[in-house]
């Protein structure tokens, strides 16, 4: 029996070892301007929609951490006066929180028996969002409410680049998720086109897909749809906050490596128009600066590019300002018969 069985075991090929799944970094950009969500509540006859979004976001982050013990998350808030890293906290924020007399027991609404990683993320988010809401109360009466979503996206890609360079031993898959709210007025005029295009170029080079979840408002968002289309991301429009966690758990958990072979829940048509640097209007045909590729719907005053301050050629400007000339048709001469 030994003579029969030994060669079998000697020549048997060993099975391939199952490789562990590479960890993933999920960076979430959430827009929490109070006036934006107040307008959304008034249009949809809802109440406390931002709280429902935050609850769904916390469950979504916990689910991402549960997939792999090496997974990482980061949350950046875009509010009316700037951006703020909610998680992980910066070193200066940690020192400031330690020096304060208030402890986390004042805001401790998380179950103490929860998994440690879940509890750390949940408690930090609840505390930082509470501080941010208190800060926004003082600024709510100001009329200047600008969108800082483009800056938050740029900061998120910067964080992804830094974390990817730090993890040299293991390959880290990264993706960006943008949670924004739509109102009755078009928000494309508020967005800055050039910063968003810079984010698209950076994400494409880093191979970091950008997913967008737009809650309420119009289904179309020109620049955000262009962002998801160029970076192989998912654009999802949700009418209300009801069932948001189900949308996040189904559409936003698609692995980047599987997206080329999976039908993504995107809209069929994408508007690839750009916006004018001066007026902010979305245009299909316009003037382009040959130096910085700035798009203009009108000829700028002074014949200078408003973005790079390049001087345009006077002969070219004269040709552009020249109105089309319609040639007159020559009257046919009547031929008289003899």
Curated annotation (Swiss-Prot):
Coiled coil: none annotated. It comes from the Eukaryota. The modification N-acetylmethionine is found at residue 1. Gene3D superfamilies: von Willebrand factor, type A domain. GO terms for cellular component: nucleotide-excision repair factor 3 complex; transcription factor TFIIH core complex; transcription factor TFIIH holo complex. A zinc finger (C4-type) spans 289-308. One of its GO terms (molecular function) is zinc ion binding. Pfam families: Tfb4. GO terms for biological process: nucleotide-excision repair; regulation of DNA-templated transcription; transcription by RNA polymerase II; transcription initiation at RNA polymerase II promoter. Keywords: Acetylation, DNA damage, DNA repair, Metal-binding, Nucleus, Transcription, Transcription regulation, Zinc, Zinc-finger. InterPro entries: TFIIH_Tfb4/GTF2H3, vWFA_dom_sf. It is found in: Nucleus. Component of the 7-subunit TFIIH core complex composed of XPB/SSL2, XPD/RAD3, SSL1, TFB1, TFB2, TFB4 and TFB5, which is active in NER. The core complex associates with the 3-subunit CTD-kinase module TFIIK composed of CCL1, KIN28 and TFB3 to form the 10-subunit holoenzyme (holo-TFIIH) active in transcription. An additionnal subunit, TFB6, plays a role in the dissociation of the SSL2 helicase from TFIIH after transcription initiation. Belongs to the TFB4 family. Component of the general transcription and DNA repair factor IIH (TFIIH) core complex, which is involved in general and transcription-coupled nucleotide excision repair (NER) of damaged DNA and, when complexed to TFIIK, in RNA transcription by RNA polymerase II. In NER, TFIIH acts by opening DNA around the lesion to allow the excision of the damaged oligonucleotide and its replacement by a new DNA fragment. In transcription, TFIIH has an essential role in transcription initiation. This is General transcription and DNA repair factor IIH subunit TFB4. It comes from Saccharomyces cerevisiae (strain ATCC 204508 / S288c).
